[in-house]
């Protein structure tokens, strides 16, 4: 108390005329009282806030851990799906190759069968043409024989031939 001017009244009691020091002391006393009572409440609020923040951090960590786990699971499922898709593609390629080979083999068999059928058809047509030619030759020969027979055939020879044919016909019917 540098500039302290006090007047002593009645020996023990003093009156302090320095207002600044008194105000500072009064302010310190008020602050001590306020901090004592309000400080407990403020410490409680700060402790609650601290606990709330810690709880939020724990929950955030837990959610982050769960998100990481879900991400790992999703990545694992993606890898499995990609592996399955690759396997399906490989199986499809194998199936395509097998179908291709089967188609080529079937086509070759069809070509061979068509070649055989063509050969058989040609043989059949050739035989048919030969048979028609043979039939025409036989008809022509028979016609020429008839003409010669008709020219040289007398009625007695004609009767003998007819009788002979009748006997052959009856013999063939009897047997």
Curated annotation (Swiss-Prot):
Residues annotated as transmembrane: 24-46
Record has Lyase as a keyword: no
Cell compartments where the protein resides: Plastid, Chloroplast thylakoid membrane
Keyword terms of this UniProt record: ATP synthesis, ATP-binding, CF(0), Chloroplast, Hydrogen ion transport, Ion transport, Membrane, Nucleotide-binding, Plastid, Thylakoid, Transmembrane, Transmembrane helix, Transport
Primary site of residence: plastid
Family in the record: Belongs to the ATPase B chain family.
Subunit and partners: F-type ATPases have 2 components, F(1) - the catalytic core - and F(0) - the membrane proton channel. F(1) has five subunits: alpha(3), beta(3), gamma(1), delta(1), epsilon(1). F(0) has four main subunits: a(1), b(1), b'(1) and c(10-14). The alpha and beta chains form an alternating ring which encloses part of the gamma chain. F(1) is attached to F(0) by a central stalk formed by the gamma and epsilon chains, while a peripheral stalk is formed by the delta, b and b' chains.
The protein, known as: ATP synthase subunit b, chloroplastic
Organism classification: Eukaryota, Viridiplantae, Chlorophyta, core chlorophytes, Trebouxiophyceae
Gene designation per UniProt: atpF
